């Protein structure tokens, strides 16, 4: 599991198997995170929040744009992984990876459009200013059936808005 930018084992040392649904073959074993690991991830996300929230909209946009580029470059590999892990036909997996990447591109552009508002007041000496600000850590739990696109659909807007994220993928499709 990835916590605070580092790959780590679960504190319990437990693992679970990821299997190919077509033949039952074990693809890999991954750390079986528990409450302690979740708490570490949440603490790390809170620790990273001030710096990420302070990043400019253009900086966040550039990072999301780079993530989009990387997904496009690795589309075939990601689709193959999805096919082996989930059983989705390769053509459908390629389509999903493209769809998922496009969410990142969309939110890379939306990150630059976090506009505020000035609202007139009934009093001549006042006006109301609305500023959109990051709210904190976002918890994202994703399903097995559209694992890649649901990750980018949830993580993309959170990162664009300046929030940090703790992602819990479906146990059936943690590699996607």
Identify the role of each PLM range.
Residues 25-115, 125:
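Glycine-rich loop-to-alpha-helix module at the N-terminal edge of alpha/beta enzyme cores
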Residues 117-176:
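Conserved small-residue-rich beta-alpha loop and adjacent elements
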């Amino acid at each position: 599991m990835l916590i605070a930018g580092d790959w780590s084992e679960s504190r319990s040392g437990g693992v679970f198997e990821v299997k190919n649904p077509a033949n039952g073959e074990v693809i890999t074993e991954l750390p079986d995170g528990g409450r302690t690991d979740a708490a570490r991830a949440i603490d790390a996300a809170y620790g990273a929040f001030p710096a990420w929230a302070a990043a400019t909209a253009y900086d966040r946009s550039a990072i999301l744009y780079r993530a989009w580029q990387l997904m496009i470059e690795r589309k075939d590999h990601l689709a193959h992984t999805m096919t082996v892990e989930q059983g989705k036909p390769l053509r459908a997996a390629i389509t999903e990876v493209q769809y998922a990447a496009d969410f990142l591109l969309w939110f890379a552009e939306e990150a630059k459009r976090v506009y505020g508002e000035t609202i007139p007041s009934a009093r001549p000496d006042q006006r109301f200013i609305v500023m959109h600000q990051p709210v904190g850590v976002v918890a994202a739990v994703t399903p097995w059936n559209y694992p890649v696109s649901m990750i980018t659909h949830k993580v993309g807007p959170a990162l664009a808005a300046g929030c940090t994220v703790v992602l819990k993928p479906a146990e059936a499709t943690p590699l996607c």
